[in-house]
UniProtKB/Swiss-Prot annotation:
Family statement drawn from the similarity comment of this UniProt entry: Belongs to the UPF0250 family.
InterPro entries, alphabetized: UPF0250_YbeD-like, YbeD-like_sf
SUPFAM superfamilies reported for this sequence: YbeD/HP0495-like (SSF117991)
One GO CC term on file: cytosol
Taxonomy, superkingdom: Bacteria
Protein name, entry field: UPF0250 protein Sputw3181_1029
Source species of the chain: Shewanella sp. (strain W3-18-1)
Length: 88
């Protein structure tokens, strides 16, 4: 697992924003939502912005997380999506 201090800094459960940056592909948003649904089922409305040249998408999604481990799992799973460059 990751070595984070989320448990010291946050009160759970809480809404937590994830920003996923990846190659511009029409299915990227659907892949992000699918991973989030697997770990935190809910009704999500992510926002997607294209980079200035259109090469990358930035997807922001707010997820209700229940623990430090929950956040770390989501970071790991989102980073494993094909085409994802960064998870912030």
């Amino acid at each position: 697992m990751l070595d984070t201090k989320f448990d010291e800094l946050m009160d759970f459960p809480c809404a937590f924003p994830f920003k996923v940056v990846g190659d511009a592909h029409e299915a990227l948003t659907d892949r992000v939502v699918a991973v989030v649904q697997k770990h935190a089922p809910g009704d999500y409305a992510p926002t997607t912005k294209a980079s200035s040249k259109g090469s990358y998408y930035s997807i922001t999604i707010r997820v209700t997380v229940t623990s430090k481990d929950h956040i770390e799992t989501l970071y790991t799973e989102l980073a494993a999506i094909e085409g994802v460059r960064r998870v912030l």
